[in-house]
Amino acid sequence: MELEAKLHEIKKPIMVLGTSSGAGKSLTVTAICRILKNLGEEPIPFKGQNMSNNAWVDWEGGEMAYSQALQAFACGINPAAEMNPILLKPQGNSISEVIHLGKSIGTTTAKNYYKDWFTPGWEVIKKSLKSIYEGNPNCRLIIEGAGSPVEMNLIHRDLTNLRVAKYLNANCILVTDIERGGVFAQIIGTLELMKPEEKKLIKGIIINRFRGDLSLFEDGKKWIENKTQIPVVGIIPWLNDSFPPEDSLDLIEKKSLSKNPEIKVGIIKLPSISNFSDFDPLENEETIFIEWIRKSQNLSKYDFIILPGSKQTIKDQIFLENSGLSKDIRDYSKNKGNIVGICGGLQMLGTTLEDPYFKEGSKNYSEQKIKGIGLLPLKTTFFKKKLTRQIKSKSIWPCQSEINGFEIHNGQTVLDEIQSSLKINPIFEDSDLGWYKENNKGGTIAGTYIHGIFENDSWREHYINLIRKSKNLPTLNKKSISYKEKRQFIIDNLANEFHKHLNLKSFLS
């Protein structure tokens, strides 16, 4: 039986729409997921289409947006690609990789996407919704929209917002960010651009990120309710930076949480950075201060440098070379510097990058084979097929411990025999997952394909202690709460803050 015929049998979905990008949809959905879980419901997150290079890999090897994975954690369930059936991964120049149900199926321009991919995209969304309900008949979907639901030039091709809301007859909440100003115009303008049948789906309004005394907005609340005839179901206070950023823009603007830093970490801000959630565990370390490196400079003030993942490794390596950052990194390594490269960062630390199929940002034949930074004797070739999988392994360095994480990459990395005099060692028992090299003057150069490596508490703590030892700082022997437990604690705090100020009763009937 088709899902449409069974909609009267399912629990009414809750959909969170926003007046703009960055209004707070992702965190609102995350909070609602945990609130409903705590109330004994079976929430499941859903976002029909997401555009992000911050990805997660589920246990079937399917790619999905990290924000939906985080929402699944809030629900107490394993992430699955059907929670985000369409993922678009920007590659620059208005080109994106298209991922359906976790699998890469090609690339497209923005113009061609709306022309050629709309119908198959809608079918994938409906297929995912049907699968979720068949496997979880008692669940309540908590759905996230994207951007604004009333982009009038795109609304007839919008797969993520009102089309999904109408299909499921969802109870919708409209979220707006008062921190940015202009909430009255945003709310009224958004509602006025909706058709009458769409506006009827909006059952509540949330004012997000309110600073100061909430009672000072009482007159504003009454005005909105009188003007729209829709209740303001929540005025959420401004929450500090301890909650996860929603997208890459938020991340770059985010300040380090450390109040008493003993270790200073520099992360290279690549133009095509991906999987920035890799650094969340470091953000939550009390003794670590993180700074983003955007331009050429003397790097000696940093205790270690991270080269993050990249969606366009060739393009980003050319940026590093042209900007002078490649030389800065090489100079840093000669001065007892410690460096960690993750995925694309690992590849760039090698000697050679070859892109025969133009998969990683090479624009012409002269860019198909370029030099890497040259700190590890490794060469990488990018192939058409992408490897996506969950990882369970054991580390050899800097400690022996169980390791979990995931891989997402096209490149295959092997030892560069011409540079084999640069001795390297495997980091893991699965030797193709990462390598490290100790400098003669001190410091280590390490690279791994494992995203989420810093989520492994023992590995992270041993690496940090390696850095501390190089600074003659005492070893941290604390058996601290694990990062994954801390992530749950952060989600609980988020949900508790929302629950204090959000009335969901009318949405649970």
From Swiss-Prot:
It comes from the Bacteria. InterPro entries: Class_I_gatase-like, CobQ/CobB/MinD/ParA_Nub-bd_dom, CobQ_GATase1, CobQ_N, CobQ_synth, GATase_3, P-loop_NTPase. The keyword Transferase does not apply. Residues 262-459 form the GATase cobBQ-type domain. One of its GO terms (biological process) is cobalamin biosynthetic process. CDD domains: CobQ_N (cd05389), GATase1_CobQ (cd01750). Keywords: Cobalamin biosynthesis, Glutamine amidotransferase. One of its GO terms (molecular function) is ABC-type vitamin B12 transporter activity. PROSITE patterns: GATASE_COBBQ. The active site is at C343 (nucleophile), H451. Pathway: Cofactor biosynthesis; adenosylcobalamin biosynthesis. Gene3D superfamilies: 3.40.50.880, P-loop containing nucleotide triphosphate hydrolases. PANTHER family: COBYRIC ACID SYNTHASE, DETHIOBIOTIN SYNTHETASE. Belongs to the CobB/CobQ family. CobQ subfamily. Catalyzes amidations at positions B, D, E, and G on adenosylcobyrinic A,C-diamide. NH(2) groups are provided by glutamine, and one molecule of ATP is hydrogenolyzed for each amidation. This is Cobyric acid synthase. The gene is cobQ.
